[in-house]
């Protein structure tokens, strides 16, 4: 519960519509194009999700509306897990995107951090954009694919941003390993494990390059068994 409360303190969600609007998701023609898995750059095939450098959000984060179901039928076996994860990923991506927009290379150098820090933050932002696309594709066409909310984060300088970044990466790894236990399909479990490995790399970079601490903490990381307690905090309509 401490982890859940702490993440709630990090991610302060503001309402983006009145109650009636929250019950009736609004989409757009641009968002509905995301139904097709090969629309736009494909994770694993496009370098966009590692090498993009720019202040504006990369695809698919430049399209923030929810994706409405395109056919009727029962939801996929793991749709709810992926929906919760996609909601959380929007919050995580938005954190890094705000960092990219707020700071620049000089901001971190003048604060005493390595001159590669801003570039690495952009790369992590790109990775998180790729996660958005992966999670969208994992949700079946019979289920809603969540869009973004508006997010506020308690950082006001490079140091407070990096502190929050480290915590978010630790929390991400923890609830992802917990979600693996909730997924029923082996393909879902494998995809979540692969994403958790990427989040761990982000965490290790932060611990070693930013804080100069030993990233080795034992033979196993923490598995948070109630991952939805964390993810539910990212759902503004709950």
For each predicted feature, which ranges?
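All-alpha RGS (Regulator of G-protein Signaling) helical domain and cognate RGS-like helical scaffolds
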Residues: 22-238
């Amino acid at each position: 519960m401490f982890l859940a409360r702490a993440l709630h303190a990090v991610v302060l969600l503001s309402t983006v519509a009145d109650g009636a609007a929250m019950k009736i998701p609004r989409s757009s023609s641009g968002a509905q194009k995301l139904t097709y898995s090969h629309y736009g750059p494909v994770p694993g095939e496009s370098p966009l999700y590692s090498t993009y450098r720019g202040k504006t959000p990369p695809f698919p984060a430049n399209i923030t509306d929810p994706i409405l179901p395109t056919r009727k039928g029962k939801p996929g076996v793991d749709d709810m897990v992926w929906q919760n994860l996609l909601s959380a990923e929007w919050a995580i991506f938005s954190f890094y995107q705000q960092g990219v927009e707020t700071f620049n290379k000089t901001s971190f150098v003048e604060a005493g951090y390595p001159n590669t820090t801003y570039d690495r933050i952009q790369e992590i932002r790109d990775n998180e954009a790729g996660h958005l696309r992966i999670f969208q594709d994992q949700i079946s066409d019979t289920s809603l694919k969540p869009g973004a909310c508006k997010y506020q984060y308690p950082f006001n300088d490079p140091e407070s941003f990096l502190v929050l970044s480290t915590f978010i990466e630790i929390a991400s790894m923890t609830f992802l390993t917990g979600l693996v236990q909730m997924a029923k399909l082996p393909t879902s479990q494998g995809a979540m494990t692969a994403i958790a490995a990427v989040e761990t790399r982000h965490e290790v970079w932060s611990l070693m390059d930013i804080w100069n601490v030993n990233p080795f903490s034992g033979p196993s990381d923490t598995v948070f068994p109630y991952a939805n307690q964390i993810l539910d905090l990212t759902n503004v309509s709950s």
